[in-house]
Amino acid sequence: ETIINLNNYIMNKKEKLEQVNHLVQKLGLSPQEAVEYFSAKVVESSSVVRECEVAVGVLPGMYVYADGLISSEIIEGRRVMAVVGSVDGSDVLAVCLHEACLPWSSDWLEAKATQEMTGGKEATRKLLEISRKKRQEAEAAQWCYDYAEDGVIQGEAFLPSLTELEKLFANKAAINASLKALGAALLEGWYWSSTENGSNHAWLFNMF
């Protein structure tokens, strides 16, 4: 399974909205004048409000749109990028809509580096760094890193850690309900983690 971390994404949205608010104040515009301007540009004011609520209102199963909106509803005309998988304080993970059946490493890569890592993004990059140095394959990690579908930026997705897969499993029902509504692959079966288990093994997680 491929996931992305929404923390920076949400922070960027908040920063942009704060900049807009600062500009409105600097220009001496009233909130009504600002709304009228955006309405004239065919930007729904309700979308801005919903984006403001993202940081405190995100729940597992919500849809993450490529244009920046996070909503509990499927909105016609907008492209869904991922589904929120877990919300743990300020740590928000989202499940991408496509998956692949690949080996962890067809070369039996021994990275000996990710056993204690709880963050899949860091672990994925470490695995790929070592695989390049050793000139050995790390297919699952590489596929996740290269993922660039539905608006996901290449390099942002990663192979989740064992800890992160456990978080997704806790919210499996909500995630799968949204994935099913989109016609995407459900969280079912066995999934590789980026967490190593011993010298030449890695943890698998059963989503059944």
Q: What is the predicted role of each segment?
A:
Residues 12-153:
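Short, compositionally biased
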Residues 162-208:
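C-terminal, surface-exposed recognition/capping segments
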Residues 159:
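Short aromatic/basic micro-patch
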Residues 156:
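Intrinsically disordered, low-complexity polar regions and short flexible loop motifs
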Residues 9, 102, 106, 141, ...:
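Short, low-complexity intrinsically disordered segments
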Residues 1-10:
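Short, Lys/Arg-enriched N-terminal segments with co-localized hydrophobic residues
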